[in-house]
Curated annotation (Swiss-Prot):
GO terms for cellular component: endoplasmic reticulum membrane. This is Translocon-associated protein subunit gamma. It comes from Pongo abelii. TRAP proteins are part of a complex whose function is to bind calcium to the ER membrane and thereby regulate the retention of ER resident proteins. Belongs to the TRAP-gamma family. The chain crosses the membrane at residues 28-48, 55-76, 136-157, 164-184. Residues 1-27, 77-135 are lumenal. The gene is SSR3. InterPro entries: SSR3.
Amino acid sequence: MAPKGSCKQQSEEDLLLQDFSRNLSAKSSALFFGNAFIVSAIPIWLYWRIWHMDLIQSAVLYSVMTLVSTYLVAFAYKNVKFVLKHKVAQKREDAVSKEVTRKLSEADNRKMSRKEKDERILWKKNEVADYEATTFSIFYNNTLFLVVVIVASFFILKNFNPTVNYILSISASSGLIALLSTGSK
């Protein structure tokens, strides 16, 4: 049986590894899929009102393409977030360290071990990096998706049948951002 100190150290290591893993929490997954669904459903209005594709007759097509696009956009969110999180953490490290050290010196008069201070700084740095990477990932991918949908729909595929235009523009847009998100830079 492992000593209690070993179990505590193992749980701290697990928490640290969890911060740097590609796995998303349930909250992040819900946020990503919720945003991806909304952004993927926006082009329905465009095709219903401008391209005159009937909502009822095209409901199955709209549903299938929205679900496929939702998955690909959420995949892009996750990939971009993972790449950005480490870059943001490195850039924000000094500022977060100063802020946490200042707050600890103001609020805590008791002596805190150096290890505990470092853990709090690391936790705060990861929290800030996670938040900033998440928001930027959503903004970047939403913007790119909607711009590509509009360009594809109105300029590249303008002479196609509206149904084909919808299928190609949505699949190309979501596929492109999913593909671009797999890059490491």
